Amino acid sequence: KNHGFEKVSQLKLAIAKKIKEYVVGGGFLFAMCSATDSYDIALAAEGVDICAQVYDHDPLDPRAQEKLDFSKCLAFQNFSLEKNPYIYEYSNIDATRTRKLRESEDYFSLFEFSAKWDPIPTMLTQNHSRIIKAFMGQTTSFNKKAIKPKVLIMGENKHANEAKYIHSEYGLGFFTFYGGHDPEDYVHYVGDPPTDLSLHPNSPSYRLILNNILFPAAKEKKRKT
């Protein structure tokens, strides 16, 4: 209420809309873990109460699912909300609960792109490895059925039918979403100590994060005439 909102969910919606406005205006958004799907869920649910009573002291809209407007979303569509407050999940965008992979077999592969025809995906997938060890998060990976057709999948686990690393233009800007929390801590729990980055100088997953940090600086320089 100190910020002029009646509910926390209304404040979070305002933040999601401001982030979308930034991208539409030409900004670049890089997000990981639950920062990926939670934005789109908030945007699709504008004006709809999707929060269980335990969160905001009033019941959620019984028609919440059918009132979602996927046209407002950046990356996802046709997803179903998780309405049970006792299940650690927002929707079926995240594939954490449906994937049947052991840690020893949990990998994803990067697609190859042409630097001539696809310069941005080429920059974002630069790596010394094309097969990369996966990792968990509150949002681990993305159900392919929930991804909008215009969104480019740059990394996937084909066997599990899930995307790990996606990118798209939006308005005048771009966004890249990367599923999972900490690439070098397979299951990172709340309260766990931070990973010592010095122990992983050649991490292919950290390289993908670095690609996104450096991407905004990769602007074409003006040529002398």
Regions found by a protein language model. Give the residues of each.
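Short alpha-beta junction capping motif
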Residues: K1-S38, L172, N212
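Conserved aromatic-histidine-acidic binding/catalytic patches
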Residues: H3, K7, K20, G27-A31, ...
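Flexible glycine/proline-enriched surface loops and loop-helix/loop-strand junctions
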Residues: H3, V23-V24, R63, V190-D196
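Generic recognition of flexible, low-complexity loop/linker segments
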Residues: K17-I19, Y55, S141, A163-I166
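An acidic, glycine-rich "communication" segment
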Residues: M32-L152
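Extracellular ligand-binding/catalytic regions of CAZymes and related secreted enzymes
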Residues: D49, K144-T225
